[in-house]
C-alpha cells in the first residue's frame, strides 16, 4: 500500500500522537518513514516599534530551535528504528511550513503524509489548523490527519 510515509511534526502533544501512529503504520506496512520538523524563521521584530532583536540574537534563537527540532526528529528515528522501520529525520528552516511539508513529500517521494490536525499555534477549539488545511487543499499526496 504505502511505501514511504512523511511524518510532519512540530513537537506539540498532538504531533507526538501522530508520531506514534506514523511509526506504527510504517511498521505494519513495511514502509519507510521520513520524520520532518519545519522550524519557522524568527522575526527581528514582533510588533512595530516594540521589541527588536539583533541579527546575532535572531540567529542564536533560530539555531536553538533547529537543534531542538533535530533532537525531536532523532528521537522519532530512534523509536522507528527500534521497531525495525527504516527512518530518517529532516529539519527544514522556513516560514512556509505547509509548502515545506509538501516539498519534502515530493523530494523524498512519499506516498502518504501523516500530521496532526493542529499544532502549537492552533487553539484547542479550532478543528483544523491552517498548515494542515493548506497541506490538504494544495497537495496531491494523501494525508492522514490525527487529532
PLM segments and residue spans:
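Structural beta-alpha unit
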Residues: 1, 75-113
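Small/aliphatic-rich secondary-structure junction motif
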Residues: 1-55, 79-88
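Short secondary-structure boundary segments
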Residues: 37, 116-118, 147
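Short, hinge-like loop/turn segments at secondary-structure boundaries
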Residues: 50-54, 105-108, 131-132
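A short acidic, glycine-rich active-site loop
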Residues: 55-71
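Glycine-rich, Arg-bearing micro-motifs that act as flexible, cationic patches
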Residues: 112-137
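Short, flexible loop segments at boundaries between secondary-structure elements
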Residues: 141-146
